[in-house]
Amino acid sequence: MENVHNWLALASVGLSGQRYRQLSEHISLTELVALPASTLQQIGLTQRQAHGLCYEAASWVEQALQWQAEAPDQHLITFEHPLYPPLLKETRQPPLVLFVKGNAKLLRLPQMAMVGSRSPTPTGRKVARQLAAELTYNGMVVTSGMAQGIDSECHLGALEAGGQTLAVLGHGLRQIYPSSNKRLAAEIVQAGALISEYFPEVRARAEFFPQRNRIVVGLSNGTVVVEAALKSGSLISAQLAVDYNRDVFAVPGAFYNSQAAGCHYLIQQGAKLVTSVADILEERALFVDNGLISKQEKNVTLDLCSQQLLDNVGDDPIPADLLAERAGMTVTDVSITLLELELVGKVAVVPGGYIKVGST
């Protein structure tokens, strides 16, 4: 519990995971939070950070612990917590604490980020829902930012397909923005999770939303852009994915559709063109080859359930949610086990679900 207090204290002053890693080479977590303000400034913290850590952090820590205690589905995932996403930890500015409401275990499952316009065309909305649904059928968690437009459509597509989805918010979890998404947020909590790096009481501010995007992308194996203008923030998300060495996918549109101009630009720059979910699934093997599915995820024990799942997989594609129903398992457990079976060559992911391959 002491370490949780310390992580929260550092997070309350905006210290990033990158900066903490640098400091941790010379000083322990416990020693760091106990330093006087003058020494904190000498080792590189700003005056504001040093003052906050010494004189204001305790109230933020108390607030966070109170929020966690209010409900069993409210979690504090610190930088050293076993559920902290390894892909996010690899990025340049990982948050020291994630506030999670919902199923925190989903943080460790393979994810696909989906982003796009806040004012999409009807076609864009339809494509976003369909792609999100098909990704969940094939064992991926859909991750987005719960903004109006494409973000919301992606979450809805995953939910309507019986899949799992994560929403990364640009504010604390005691509020929902936009307020029109309160019902969607409640549904996401039931079948996924809301995530934020901001303390629960922190209200939405314009500058928080670009920061939120680095987490959406950082959590994910790849990023799909569905409708984006040339000056869209989605292009920033795509550039982040490139910086993180993750795949970028873009859905093309009509040449006269200004909302597709950003996607066309991304394709010209080397993003993978998406005409169906198969174009995304073809890259799934690369996630493993490039190390984008972590070693920790590969170490999940299969002894009790792998054969049970294999008995329900044949030559015809079967989606993960139907496998879960037949095997009497949760979709989360099925997704983890299917990933393991895929890595050892027992099953393969194809459009429509999973098929059995190799000898059993």
Q: For each predicted feature, which ranges?
A:
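Short, small/acidic-rich helices and loops at N termini and domain boundaries
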Residues: 1-82, 344-353, 357-360
